[in-house]
Structures are given as structure tokens and as C-alpha cells.
Amino acid sequence: MNAITTLNGTTATFTVRGDIDFDTLPPLRAAADALPAHVTDLRWDLNHTCFMDIAGLHLLFAPTPPGHAYRRITVTGLRPQPLRLLRLAAETNPATFPLDRLLCDVRAPL
């Protein structure tokens, strides 16, 4: 897995290439935590991510760490398996996994 970070004003986009699992979660989380303080929007581009396990849920729905400002998190380019996982999580526990605030380009009905 590798990730490319693009900064555009107050938005950071992480383009992830490869799976998101417990092996790849720590470096992704560290990269997000290291973003400059002026970044208020964090977008995960998952066009090249075919598989995501529960670690992806931890990455996308983690609470804001103490001492960090709130960042709006969105995801784009969801492939079928990660989208299926997110939908299942939202169906099981919509209060914990509010899918509507995360998705920015999925046109299929939720």
C-alpha cells in the first residue's frame, strides 16, 4: 500500500493505492495526524483500494484525537467491497457509522 497526499488550500486528499487493513492502518493514521493545522477537510480517494476491513472503519470514523481540531472527513472512489462494508456498518449501527456524512460521490441508493 502507498498513499499520495495532495494539499489544496484547507483540503487534503489521500489517494490510497492498495488494501486498507490493520497492517496499513498505522501509517495512514500517522499521515493524517501529521497534516498541517490549517487543513479542515480530509478526503480519502479510494479509487485504487479494492479491499478494506474493519481497520478502514477505524480510519474513517475515528473520533478527533485530543488536541487536534475537527476535520470533515469524506471518501470518494469507493470500489464495491469497501462500499459494501460501509453500508453494512451503517445498517448495523447508523449512529456510530453515519454514512451520509462520509460519502461525497456515491450515486447508488443507500
Where are these regions (language model features)?
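STAS-like cytosolic regulatory interaction modules
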Residues: 1-110
